[in-house]
């Protein structure tokens, strides 16, 4: 019987740094980007990638899929803004407010519950952006 090795990806942080440098060349001066590093940096290591690019001036912050990923980035020492792209369950609201992690809100009731938690923690938390205005 033939033996097949598992497929694996070997990622060079130098290559990632190079790729971010190339992206920077293609964005307008003063423009900031959000680095999406969900799913453990798509399997390349969210912690290593976050540590590498955290200091880049054109990185506004990071986007992840879940509350767990966001909390993990905070535990790694990420201080820039973190946006969760997926659904966050109410049980995570206290941690999200405390850690200043941003959520996408899809229902008014969710905004109300987040607001209640922010008031409980005596923090300003909710910002509403009207993207329909030009």
Q: Which role does the model predict for each range below?
A:
Residues 2-11, 15-18, 31-134:
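Active-site-proximal beta-alpha core segment in soluble small-molecule metabolic enzymes
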């Amino acid at each position: 019987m033939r033996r097949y090795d598992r497929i694996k990806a070997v990622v060079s942080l130098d290559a990632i740094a190079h790729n971010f440098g190339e992206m920077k060349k293609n964005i307008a001066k003063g423009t900031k980007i959000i680095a999406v590093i969900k799913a453990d940096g798509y399997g390349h290591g969210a912690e290593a990638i976050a540590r590498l690019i955290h200091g880049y001036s054109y990185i506004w912050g990071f986007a992840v899929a879940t509350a767990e990923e966001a909390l993990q980035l905070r535990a790694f020492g990420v201080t820039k803004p973190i946006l969760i792209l997926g659904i966050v369950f109410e049980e995570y609201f206290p941690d999200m407010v405390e850690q200043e992690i941003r959520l996408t809100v899809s229902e008014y009731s969710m905004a109300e519950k987040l607001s209640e938690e922010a008031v409980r923690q005596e923090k300003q938390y909710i910002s509403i952006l009207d993207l329909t205005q030009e």
